[in-house]
Amino acid sequence: MNTNDNRLKAHKLIDHIFQDLLPAHGMAQRPEQIQLSHRMLDAMQDGRIALCDAGTGIGKTYAYLAAATAASAFPTGQIARPIIISTSSIALQNAVLMEYLPLLSCILMADGILTKPLKAVIRKGKSHYVCDERLDRRLRQVNLGKKNPEALAALRTLKETLDMDRVSHLSGYDRERVCVPQVCDCKQRDCRYQRFLKTCDKDQFLFQICNHNLLVADAIHRSEGKRPIFPEHSIIIVDEAHKLPETAQQMLGVTLAAEEIRNLILHLKEERYLLAAEMLEDSTGPLLRKLAQPREEAEPVEACLRLLTAPSCTLPIIQRQIGSLLSPLGSRQLNTVLDAVKLFTSSQTDMIFYTAEDVSTGGAMLCAAAGDITQRIKKILWQPD
């Protein structure tokens, strides 16, 4: 491999894409887009970090896709597949997969540069995928006579569809009960989720697309010596990067949302620990009502923290009395809420407590972040060991 020749060929390919191929398909030639793509390619070839400001209308998505494709086609070093693309919006993830990459593949194949399409896959967290074992159990439990027909049809559709986001009319209740659990030790050879993970680990996809949460989660796993979420890779493209710090702050910290408390109460009722559920419902009532209100910027976080006094007394009692009797899921839910409440009622000086909008409800949620968050992001994401 001649490094200098490949570097030159990669840059020539970018010029060819933006000066010849895309204009032939009705797209305007934009000098700023070409310069941006060359700058991105330089960073990829040199293994550097590049912070690229792309104004509206420049065409940043094609700029980084062209640069990544050129870097892969003409490597100047060891390029580890896949190339990771992280965005903050589902709409952009779908657009990259369904619109941008198919068109780029089409024109490059028509020109003889590629012999097969650029392959990509969207990666998501476990809660977005169905667990075959839990789905079978749920279908056995459901009352066919009382179940909403659309919700029942959605459940049955999951027998053929792994990604639950692609199934309409699936209730939140059913979704929680059939998704892949956070602790998954499935040994089934025919498990669709495990087969999907194995496929993603193979050298099959040039691009793996994810949201910022999954990107940060992978970085945290690697920093803690845990099994990585993504295969080894040498190029990361962070689109909508202005939203990465907020995501990292949440991922590296602790949150307490009303939904977590309500789910715990519901689970206690399902396992017939009605007194414990009633105690928790009573002690968390004022907090839940507060979190249901839209977040006010000027209101101090102490207004919410004061409402944790009662739950901080109730939760340890529940833990002592029935903690060892709960199902694994119930135990994890109880421990998660208990640990969060302990943190928010502690006097740790190295933590920053604040409220943030809970986008799922329109209300607020409690957040705790380490005071050295900038250094932690730098260490796990930009300067890993």
Regions found by a protein language model. Give the residues of each.
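A substrate-engagement module of RecA-like helicase motors
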Residues: 2-23, 28-31, 75-208, 212-213, ...
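N-terminal pre-P-loop "Q-motif" helix
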Residues: 27-44
